[in-house]
Amino acid sequence: MKYYAAGQTSVDKTTFADGQVNGPYLGGTGIYGYGGIRVWTEDVSPVLNVASDFYDFYGTWIDENRVDRTHLNLAYDKTFFVDMVYQENGYYESIYTIQEKIDNAFLYGYTNCRLEQIARIAGPQAALYLYYEPINTVFWEKFREIRDASGLKVMWEPGFSVCDSGFREIFLKIMETFRPDMSTLNWFEASAMFGTKDEEELIRIIESFQVPFFFFRCGKRGAYALAGGKRFFVPSIDVEGYETVDPTGCGNASSAGAMYGWLETGNPVMAAVMGNISGGFNVGQFGIIPRFDEKMRQTAFAKASQVYSRLLAENPSWEKELEPFLRK
């Protein structure tokens, strides 16, 4: 399987609830997603529309990590700068003036992955992590035609600057129209969109989408793997040497890592374990993971095996619940 990650690039600054300010540093949804997969395999490429100053920021990182440039498309002038402000509960939002929001909304369109870019990488042995807003139903109708004709596997992470119930109708329409192979939301997004803080109710709503694999992220607590009418909660995973520094991008990295785990194993628990391990690497510094190597990959696979064995020992009923997935 060949893997791809599509989203945005940005230079980020974070302000935490205690007033600590860090940055600027390299970020972006597409790059974080790429990192979540690259932890596990070198067979992954970013699919990005980039700015003319992109290599001024990312050039050294790309060279040192031998990142495939084939699908980097020059599309606009200046890389986005994003200012994220976190609350104590982990919720964050980007802070802009009204004029900045208007300007960014116009320019942001240049960063989104295009249908022709997707068509170029689509195939039965290809998988795409895509960060894209729940907007533009025509895009999703055309995308489904490409996906169905090619056999491309898709993990859709809906993109939100601020999520609220106003997105519910179009989100549900896209879910019905496109029917992604895999998808993900975090707790804040799901709660805001569906108007409830009841986790059981949120899970029932998500299960009604009938997505084959859904990665429901619950922040520092961990994530649910929802598949085949079953649900498995996998706590967040600490990776030795990557103590918690900054959660920015962990949703992107973990969702993309979970996609890799699901497609490689067909096991929802292992997929969530691998996703959470990708997040565990991502949280260990400000910005994107600086360096990928064989030692990291060996550490990741060893950690996955260790955590998976422990989870099955702690949850003896899971072995039987997982049988339908492991027989495929």
Feature locations, PLM:
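Conserved phosphate-binding/catalytic region of the ribokinase-like
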Residues: 198-328
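Short catalytic helix/loop segments, enriched in acidic residues and glycine
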Residues: 19-35
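Short, hydrophobic/glycine-enriched beta-strand segments
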Residues: 1-10, 155-157
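Conserved phosphate/ATP/ADP-binding segment of small-molecule kinases
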Residues: 148-153, 160-235
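Alpha-helix C-terminal capping segments
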Residues: 35-43, 261-264
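A short acidic, amphipathic alpha-helical/loop segment
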Residues: 58, 138-146, 170, 201, ...
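Glycosyltransferases and closely related glycan-assembly transferases
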Residues: 123, 140-153
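Conserved N-terminal subdomain of the carbohydrate kinase-like
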Residues: 3, 11-24, 41-129, 151, ...
